[in-house]
Amino acid sequence: MTINLSTTALIDKIAQDLGFTEISNLTDSILIKNKELISIATFLKNTPKFDFQMLVSITAVDYIEYFEIVYHLLSIQHNQRAILKLRCYDRESPSVPSVVTIWPGAELQEREIWDLKGIQFTQHHNMKRILLWEDFKGHPLRKDYLR
């Protein structure tokens, strides 16, 4: 059985090694700032203590006031899981950094989130629709989507 990594230990190590202190502990996950995503993701993948080589999934939740992007990470080496979350408060043109350069498996998942929720992943090399046709208007899984 895979063990959920202690969020407190994870936050402490990130704060110690990267100096990021504005990280919130959400019981089973950590909430990070958008601008810190790439640094933290790279750190979690490349630090032997964590070794999160696998991005299991990315999803997005529309809470109306903000979008929450959720990253599920897995370390096969340590048999541990971790969940990163970040929030995007811009409904007009939401965007977050792409993690494709860190975890190539993020490519299709980021495109799906763009297609259905309208969240742009900056620095993504192929940000186009994946499920709907290019001329489709809007993003149908947004709570403010109207036909």
Q: Which residue ranges define each predicted feature?
A:
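Terminal low-complexity/charged segments
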Residues: M1-R147
